[in-house]
């Protein structure tokens, strides 16, 4: 006899990105331009802190929210970026994923709604649905992946609890301009909703003029939650370290969810996390910038339209001209050209593919060559 399980989870599907990577793994020699993971090792000075921590037996329970000295460092780090949060308003988390999970667990009641501008990382919808709430999608493609205020207002209902924004964006690489940020602020203030800022790519920006929502709109501090991660800027994806910041009344509730989800982040990684904050990610950023230029030139040569990415390490070109669904296009590319990309439908936007350029230069060049050859056959 099969006993019932959580009906909300039953509606969720495994990650489409992981599904594509699993298919690619079945094809020897396949070049994967699919996973958003830096191809660099974690800087040695960061890793050395873990070795030292283990050597002195730093393997016991830490404070739930992270050691005070680390939270002070995170507070100062955010302050340097113009974001004012005290150490008591910061929680060290098991990656940005847990930060998002704890945030929505603390924030949502059954039947609440969260506005998700698409294309968007599929995790947002999954966490919202798992908390018995509803994801409401705002299509940003007509606005060149910016947020149109009228369209945003049309998504708001009495059940709306929050909007989640990601800038630079996964999968487009686009950054939200001032008009988009201001539109979110006006709607959030008037509707009385939270703004959850997924800022995990904020150190990976290639153009001038980038602004973060919380810095531009400090008047909404009580309604804003900031999610950050060590994974992208310092190549620490496997460490599972992130943090979040919010005003005291909000952080107090999120801290409860964090405590009962994971208790705490890993004790012997905390000194390494503090050290990471002092490491300049510019060398990696410069490599990504050069790869971005090669990707844009290659896509242009292939005749693929793309809204130029200003950050992160993705491009999101249109494939509408080929008359294939994004899923069919990507499966066909793996089977016929041995190159893996992510279908746009994984992010809620059909007719596009996500191309990740956080791979070695050799793999990137070969992958682009294979993609070009594949497109010429369609």
Task: Please name every model-derived segment.
Residues 2-5, 10-11, 23-26, 31, ...:
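PLP-dependent class I/II
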Residues 65-66:
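Short beta-strand to alpha-helix junction loop
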Residues 70-71:
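Class I S-adenosyl-L-methionine
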Residues 57-61:
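A short acidic, glycine-rich active-site loop
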């Amino acid at each position: 006899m099969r006993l019932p399980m959580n009906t909300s989870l039953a509606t969720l599907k495994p990650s489409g990105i992981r599904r594509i990577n699993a298919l690619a793994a079945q094809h020897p020699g396949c070049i994967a331009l699919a996973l958003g993971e830096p191809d660099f090792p974690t800087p040695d000075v960061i890793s050395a802190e873990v070795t030292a921590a283990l050597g002195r037996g730093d393997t016991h329970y830490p404070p739930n929210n992270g050691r005070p000295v680390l939270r002070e460092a995170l507070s100062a780090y955010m302050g340097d970026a113009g974001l004012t949060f005290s150490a008591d308003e910061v929680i060290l988390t098991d990656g940005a994923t847990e930060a998002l999970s704890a945030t929505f667990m603390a924030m949502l009641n059954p039947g609440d709604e969260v506005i998700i501008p698409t294309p968007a990382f599929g995790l947002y919808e999954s966490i919202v649905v798992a908390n018995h709430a509803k994801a409401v999608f705002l299509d940003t493609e007509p606005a060149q992946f910016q947020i149109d205020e009228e369209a945003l207002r049309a998504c708001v209902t009495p059940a709306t609890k929050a909007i989640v924004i990601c800038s630079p964006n996964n999968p487009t690489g686009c950054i939200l301009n001032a008009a988009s940020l201001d539109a979110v602020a006006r709607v959030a203030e008037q509707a009385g909703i939270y703004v959850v800022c997924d800022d995990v790519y904020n150190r990976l920006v290639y153009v001038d003029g980038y602004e973060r929502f919380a810095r531009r709109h400090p008047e909404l501090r009580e309604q804003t939650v900031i999610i950050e991660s060590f994974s992208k800027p310092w190549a620490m994806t496997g460490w599972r370290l992130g943090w979040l910041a919010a005003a005291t009344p909000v952080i107090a509730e999120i801290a409860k969810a964090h405590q009962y989800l994971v208790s705490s982040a890993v004790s012997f990684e905390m000194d390494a996390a503090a050290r990471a904050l002092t490491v300049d990610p510019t060398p990696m950023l410069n490599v990504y910038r050069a790869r971005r230029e090669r990707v844009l030139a290659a896509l242009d040569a292939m005749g693929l339209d793309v809204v130029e990415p200003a950050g992160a390490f993705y491009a999101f070109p249109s494939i509408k001209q080929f008359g294939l669904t994004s899923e069919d296009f990507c499966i066909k590319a793996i089977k016929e050209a041995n190159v893996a990309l992510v279908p746009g439908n994984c992010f809620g936007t059909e007719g596009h593919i996500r191309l990740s350029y956080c791979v070695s230069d050799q793999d990137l060049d070969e992958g682009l060559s294979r993609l070009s050859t594949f497109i010429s056959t369609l």
